[in-house]
Amino acid sequence: SSLNGKADGNLKTAIFKLVRNFTQVSSYSALPQYFQKTDVYPNSSRWWDMYSDIVLYAPSFKGLNREHSFPKSWWGGSTTVPAYVDLNHLYPSEMAANTAKSNYPLGMVDRSYNANFQNGISTVGYPVSGQGGGAKYVFEPDDEFKGDFARTYFYMASAYQDLTWKYTYMVSQNLWPTLNSWSVDLLLK
């Protein structure tokens, strides 16, 4: 494979070249149909939601949003770039959790302050010192889902390394490393 023997920036660029000709989701409005294949627990009709422990069932999408886990505002909010409808970072999300998460970077929430939002899975609040990349608030996912976010963020940083990042809370325009060290530490916990 074109990825064998590659590491760091060379691996990231090889992934970028490999995935550039991917099949796109037909439209943003069609995402719930795709989510029924990618984000429903096996042997049940329960939505897989990395943002909330509220149980909602497919095929109804009532109470859910289409969440850009890698916030679209980070690349300027364009709806014409392939990242906007890339299923590799779009997830069903309970509405209140999605609204609270906003476009905040992932980070560890400072527990010495009251959280702005906490639902048992997602926490939004002030970042611990050294995290957040200058953002006032951060979104901390549950430990159960940090690996999912790590894969998602690595994919997005690799597949879209040609995008100009408007917000660089977690990512830099550098070829390597792309994710800031504090965000890597969080995602590996």
Which residues are covered by each model-predicted region?
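N-terminal module-boundary/linker segments of secreted carbohydrate-active enzymes
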Residues: S1-L56
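Domain-level detector of nuclease and nuclease-like folds
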Residues: Y57-K189
